[in-house]
Amino acid sequence: MDGKLRADEVAVTKSILKSTFNMWMDVIDVDVVIVGAGPSGLTAAKYLAQKGVKTVVLERHLSFGGGTWGGGMGFPNIVVEKPADEILREAGIKLDEVDGEDELFTADSVEVPAKLGVAAIDAGAKILTGIVVEDLILKEDKIAGVVIQSYAIEKAGLHIDPLTISAKYVIDSTGHDASAVHTLARKNKDLGIEVPGEKSMWAEKGENSLTRNTREIFPGLYVCGMAANAYHAGYRMGAIFGGMYLSGKKCAEMILEKMEK
């Protein structure tokens, strides 16, 4: 390649500002906001966007995937069981059978979030990183969107007013913290919402309770993944992720069913 590269500083800045403005104008009014881009959130985003639902995923960190990247104690593998393996296969993720375990598979802890994130994006979901949801929009006893702030501004402790995104439905997929539900409970004590938090580890119990605990816990607000178990005092599971993928898929299906009515 012999051609000279064009790199005008002002043109770069203008390009970023124009694209960013157009992007924000497109996402300030959506069908679904997903808070947290972990395994359940990305899965929900994929299945919602595939059906043409306008979906935006907000993640406070600069990367998506939640705790998947670290595998188990830093070892670069996670475990997934049947039938959740089909969700990963749909995203083109390679799975290895576990000797002596007919129902279990291992997957690369870097490949999984990378390909699942791409699958959500390719389906039409928008993932925004570095954005924290600091509050919810509550109108007439229904969640109507989220209040957002730059995570960098929050970390710096600066007093700067936030912006908002309007949504028909909000999903809390923030993991163990269940931060969106905690915020709703803390700021609106008259609603009587309590978040007991998750119990200690019991992998089988925790996995099987995830889909059961995935539900609409307040008009317009759903919980999935570990946020669902935190809200319902379910057990934690460790580095087995099948329940979280199934929870995200179920959450998407519940919202799709409601939107069809």
Curated annotation (Swiss-Prot):
Catalysed reaction equations from the record: hydrogen sulfide + glycine + NAD(+) = ADP-5-ethyl-4-methylthiazole-2-carboxylate + nicotinamide + 3 H2O + H(+)
Keyword Membrane annotated: no
List of residues binding glycine: R236
Assigned keywords, A-Z: Iron, Metal-binding, NAD, Thiamine biosynthesis, Transferase
Family: Belongs to the THI4 family.
Annotated HAMAP family: Thi4
Annotated function: Involved in the biosynthesis of the thiazole moiety of thiamine. Catalyzes the conversion of NAD and glycine to adenosine diphosphate 5-(2-hydroxyethyl)-4-methylthiazole-2-carboxylate (ADT), an adenylated thiazole intermediate, using free sulfide as a source of sulfur.
PANTHER family: THIAMINE THIAZOLE SYNTHASE (PTHR43422:SF3)
Name of this chain's protein: Thiamine thiazole synthase
